[in-house]
């Protein structure tokens, strides 16, 4: 369904961009670009909803400069049921277009590189040269140390942290089920489970459930619109973090957790195992019992948790965003 038109032997035109953005500005209305043949145009991946790719293709044909792109993941194509109807086709067209114009694609994980290469082969497009760059995980130093009263109250007690937009793919629901299971079994001395993130799409029923379920009313807290200072305090103060995502192109909250020296219970899917290997504890994202048992274990067994924290401190190497930028610039 996503197969693209065959490459024109004469290279006279690029396949038409088939997206909802096609009614946007026409190429003739763009500001005149001073691009030379020796230049490299780098797009960081925020062009998927703009009508610029065909324009870039024609400009590249005319001038001969290089185009490098960044690919984060192809999750809407792989798992269309996580998104609105038509998102899979929209993104398949975007990646197809990217393949026609790119000389090089930077992927944020080996998982993304393999997923994208497989997709492009299936689409019948060119497969540009690809390389993997590691994303930064060091949050900037926070000068303003003002914290909200709600966050300060949360940080006073023992808690487990999950940082992510609240959406189906991030799988907050499995943690809710794990907590209910433990509470029903009589394990009432559990740390508070703190969700940090804005509600996304298709989670209204879930948000209603955790608000109305009296079993978790004092055990699950949702924080949103937190400041950088608040987020830093939460990372620093939590017992450990959890991240049961169903699929990732990288998994930045996992890396940020490790950068703060915090252990993470995480799912074993997508790119996540690339982040830190055996420093993490992996659980099937659908395994309610597995999540419940391991949350209970690391919440109660301070010695096991301390061993993990020591390993992270000794072995995890953080990556600055400057290092990420430098690794890209060196390959341009």
Where are these regions (language model features)?
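Carbohydrate transferase catalytic cores enriched for Leloir-type hexosyltransferases
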Residues: 1-332
């Amino acid at each position: 369904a996503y197969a693209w038109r065959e490459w024109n032997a004469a290279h006279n035109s690029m396949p038409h961009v088939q997206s909802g953005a096609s009614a946007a500005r026409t190429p003739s209305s763009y500001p005149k670009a001073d691009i030379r043949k020796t230049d490299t145009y780098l797009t960081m991946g925020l062009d998927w909803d703009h009508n610029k790719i065909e324009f870039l293709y024609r400009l590249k044909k005319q001038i001969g400069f290089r185009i490098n792109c960044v690919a984060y993941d192809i999750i809407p194509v792989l798992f269309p049921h996580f998104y609105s109807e038509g998102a899979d086709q929209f993104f398949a067209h975007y990646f197809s277009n990217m393949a026609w114009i790119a000389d090089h694609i930077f992927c944020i994980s080996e998982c993304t590189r393999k997923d994208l290469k497989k997709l492009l082969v299936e689409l019948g497009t060119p497969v540009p040269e690809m390389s993997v760059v590691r994303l930064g995980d060091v949050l900037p130093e926070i000068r303003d140390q003002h914290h909200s009263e709600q966050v300060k109250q949360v940080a006073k007690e023992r808690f487990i942290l999950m940082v992510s937009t609240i959406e189906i793919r991030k799988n907050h629901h499995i943690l809710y089920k794990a907590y209910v299971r433990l509470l029903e079994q009589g394990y009432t001395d559990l740390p508070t489970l703190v969700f940090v993130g804005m509600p996304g799409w298709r989670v209204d029923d879930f948000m209603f459930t955790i608000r109305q379920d009296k079993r978790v009313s004092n055990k699950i807290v949702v924080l949103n619109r937190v400041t950088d200072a608040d987020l830093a305090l939460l990372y620093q103060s939590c017992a450990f973090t959890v991240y049961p995502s169903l699929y990732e192109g990288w998994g930045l909250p996992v890396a940020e957790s490790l950068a703060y020296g915090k252990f993470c219970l995480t799912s074993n899917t997508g790119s996540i195992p690339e982040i830190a290997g055996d420093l993490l504890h992996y659980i099937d994202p659908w395994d309610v019992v597995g999540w419940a048992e391991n949350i209970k274990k690391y919440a109660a067994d301070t010695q096991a948790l301390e061993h993990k924290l020591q390993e992270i401190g000794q072995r995890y190497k953080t990556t600055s965003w400057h290092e990420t930028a430098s690794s890209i610039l060196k390959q341009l």
